């Protein structure tokens, strides 16, 4: 079926917003090796990942439970402010200390997590297929971010200059949301951003209205989910609604969290120690292996996040099992260095990204698509899944810190070389 101008316009806008939303976050991850080495904290590389995601968990909680009814436009303005503070802070941190750098990275992480939570919730106003535009944008952000950092370092630019150069992306993000996106007319009437969910002690008439909303949703195809929408009963309290929605998405959301835990342990904790550190080796690919691992991982994410138009995976649990096995391999590799070819490791990191991206795009597609989730509850269900993504990455950061200070401590370089400032 051909897509009209509005659909294409929105797809492009969501794509580039997804790219920008995760761009700074991905650059920080690619730079984490150099940043931790510059501050003589290679053993604490996990703290950078933790700062980049942990405070994002708080922002997701706030967006889900405290400011659910706040206008999305205001949220985006605030998010642009967070982006700017984070980038400027990281750029200035090389003149201060590691703690200041961590605080600035926290703002970068907040902007990425909060922005994702806001935009995914906002997408309930649009056809479910547009999640592919957003997901492919977030996927390409990793490729662009890691390539950008590798190229800038190769060009001899300092970390300060690199992060200052990223500031114009914030303005583009702002313009795309306010002037690029256009809510389809046939959805605008039924799905307003100011919809007030606070009065959950609804009467029978509202119960009937909810049933009708589910029945008239023409945007999505049927998925064999074993039944129709679980419409909220009359008199449902806010707490009861939270519990009911959690039950609707718990399986897919928990699988997504596990996949993210496994892949971040592999792509950060495992990849950082996957090769023997030799200061006398001037091979570009080995010297910059961690940043290149980040690129390979993000390349895999991009490919799989852009695959929704071609293949849809309903059995999410299979991806979780494969990623768990993959994580075990990378931990063993970090300890024993079994695979000596950096090129084989690069390919295996692409595979890691493929699994992660596939889980992400298919879980959110299912949430936006499944008939058993009422339209008015999709935003909350999306926020639950996004929240558990952050939980998975936060736990991964903590696990990496434990690994680097315990059974992998002997593999961490004892001396740190300064990177460019």
From Swiss-Prot:
Gene Ontology CC annotations of this record: contractile vacuole; endocytic vesicle; Golgi apparatus; lysosomal membrane
Membrane topology listed for this record: Multi-pass membrane protein
Any matching Pfam family: CLN3
Ranges where the record places region Disordered: 190-211
GO biological process terms on file: aggregation involved in sorocarp development; cell-cell adhesion; cell-substrate adhesion; hyperosmotic response; hypotonic response; intracellular water homeostasis; mitotic cytokinesis; negative regulation of cell population proliferation
TM ranges: 13-35, 47-67, 74-96, 101-123, 137-157, 161-181, 248-268, 284-304, 313-333, 338-358, 382-402
Entry's localization field: Lysosome membrane
Sugar-modified residues: 159, 196, 199-200, 203
Record field: compositional bias (Low complexity): 195-205
SUPFAM superfamilies recorded: MFS general substrate transporter
Keywords: Glycoprotein, Lysosome, Membrane, Transmembrane, Transmembrane helix
Family statement drawn from the similarity comment of this UniProt entry: Belongs to the battenin family.
Name listed for the protein in its UniProt record: Battenin
Source organism of this protein record: Dictyostelium discoideum (Social amoeba)
Gene name, Swiss-Prot/TrEMBL: cln3
